[in-house]
């Protein structure tokens, strides 16, 4: 089994609670609009309910809420949730923000779709995947979503900058899906 990357610690995850991180979070590249068509198309069961884990400011939750019956957006950062509520569609009546760690919060299952937008790497995989299995409808799907990669020259430069400027000096890029598959978690 592949080891968990060394930079994925609780201390590093806690940085997402910092107000300075929260304020710049909406400046990240947006998900292409097609992502929401694809995600909505994965839903084949009723209820058309979505659980968005590690939701942050709700980029996925806000993009899906008009296409489904409801979205429960879970994040452990109250500051991220507060920011998400102020963004477009963040106050939609079918979008329920839940503050807490997905490993322990009460869930309103079943869900036909569980999404994790660039957040799964921070979670306790041995805890969340069994929870997801219990929370999904019979034909439900877990979708781990990443933003489009930058073209190779930019991506290489970005990796250099991350290593130089990040306070996470032990950061190492890794393939999350490969690690999860080798752990046989789903």
Which residues are covered by each model-predicted region?
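Conserved class I S-adenosyl-L-methionine
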Residues: 1-45
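Short conserved AdoMet
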Residues: 44-45, 65-69, 89, 124, ...
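Conserved catalytic/acceptor-binding region of the Class I
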Residues: 133, 137-186
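A short acidic, Gly/Pro-enriched loop at the edge of an enzyme's catalytic core
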Residues: 106-114
């Amino acid at each position: 089994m592949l080891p968990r990357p060394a930079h994925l610690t609780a201390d590093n995850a806690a940085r997402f609670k910092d107000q300075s991180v929260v304020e710049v979070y909406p400046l990240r590249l947006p998900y292409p609009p097609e992502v929401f068509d694809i995600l909505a198309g994965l839903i084949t069961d009723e209820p058309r309910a979505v659980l968005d884990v590690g939701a942050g400011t709700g980029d996925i939750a806000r993009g899906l809420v008009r296409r489904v019956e409801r979205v429960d957006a879970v994040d452990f950062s109250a500051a991220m949730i507060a920011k998400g509520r102020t963004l477009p569609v963040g106050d939609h009546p079918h979008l329920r923000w839940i503050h807490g760690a997905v490993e322990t919060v009460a869930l309103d299952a079943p869900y036909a779709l569980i999404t994790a937008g660039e957040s799964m790497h921070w979670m306790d995989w041995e805890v969340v995947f069994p929870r997801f299995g219990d929370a999904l409808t019979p034909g439900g799907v877990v979708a781990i979503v990443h933003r489009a990669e930058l073209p190779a020259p930019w991506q290489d430069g970005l990796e250099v900058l991350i290593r130089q400027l990040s306070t996470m000096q032990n950061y190492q890029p890794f393939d999350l899906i490969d690690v999860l598959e080798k752990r046989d978690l789903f």
